């Protein structure tokens, strides 16, 4: 009888243990569900915070690009004023970036991108890279300059007034670096590059050509078109200041400022088309002798340097 009683007690204890285990398991499951919900909630909040931070950073970046920043310029230590990027290079500053220069006859400093590669000392007067800047502008903008003087690949036009102040200092070489949408590169180089003053309507003068892209500026690629396609000794034109040789208005038709003739075999300030572009119009970023009139290039850099430049390797 005692054995039966003991067995019953053990059975009851086991049953109670199972019920307790079941209750404990159910409680653990509920706790797991609660914790998972909390984790999911926290993950959602973290993602929301990350999105907000990204938006704030983007807004700050846009404000920075709009306003510019002194911190975007490379500090020269207040050593002296420089007439162009070649002087900066030969004074020991070999890093490409934005610097401030003051040509000999300039009344004030202005910012410019110095390309310290490719032999160093290049003053960049124009850049096209992504179509972020509008180059269909009037006379005053082209005279004084416009664009992004903050980002290293930012688009800008240095200004006809500033280009004149640079090129009257001596004999300068112009180098034009071109890139297409198939990742090919080419260049055109001209000796004796000079832009006239305001009275000459910033007339273009170029000398001997060399390079791989062909001579689109002087129009010597074909004698029958040179009379209307050459840009040599052409005055600068904009939509509101027509100085070309065409009965119409080249700048208005091509939607850019340039040294138009009737109208062009090169227009590096033309409309920027994102992607390889071919059509029955020539108002893109054009260099005829490399890709013809109906191909708009991906990127352009126009840069100048004294023709007698000797790099200081120290």
From Swiss-Prot:
Disruption phenotype: Mice develop normally but develop spontaneous autoimmune symptoms caused by T-cell activation in aged mice. Mice also display slight metabolic defects: mice are heavier than wild type mates, have abnormal plasma lipid profiles, fasting hyperglycemia with enhanced gluconeogenesis and exhibit differences in white and brown adipose tissue morphology.
GO molecular function, one term: identical protein binding
CDD domains (alphabetical): FReD
GO biological process: adaptive immune response; adipose tissue development; blood coagulation; cholesterol metabolic process; hepatocyte proliferation; negative regulation of T cell activation; regulation of glucose metabolic process; regulation of immune response
Pfam families assigned: Fibrinogen_C
Residue ranges annotated for the Fibrinogen C-terminal domain, each copy included: 76-308
GO cellular component: extracellular region
UniProt KW Disulfide bond keyword: yes
Superkingdom per UniProt: Eukaryota
Further facts: Blockade of the FGL1-LAG-3 interaction using a monoclonal antibody stimulates tumor immunity and is therapeutic against established mouse tumors in a receptor-ligand interdependent manner.
Gene: Fgl1
Chain's role: Immune suppressive molecule that inhibits antigen-specific T-cell activation by acting as a major ligand of LAG3. Responsible for LAG3 T-cell inhibitory function. Binds LAG3 independently from MHC class II (MHC-II). Secreted by, and promotes growth of, hepatocytes.
Subunit and interaction comment: Homodimer. Interacts (via the Fibrinogen C-terminal domain) with LAG3 (via Ig-like domains 1 and 2).
Paired cysteines (S-S): 85-114, 250-263
SUPFAM superfamilies noted in UniProt: Fibrinogen C-terminal domain-like
Tissue spec. comment: Mainly expressed in liver. Also expressed in brown adipose tissue.
Keyword Secreted in record: yes
Compartment(s) of residence: Secreted
Signal sequence residues: 1-22
Name of protein: Fibrinogen-like protein 1
Higher taxonomy: Eukaryota, Metazoa, Chordata, Craniata, Vertebrata
Stretches of the chain forming a coiled coil according to its record: 28-62
Keywords annotated in UniProt: Adaptive immunity, Coiled coil, Disulfide bond, Immunity, Secreted, Signal
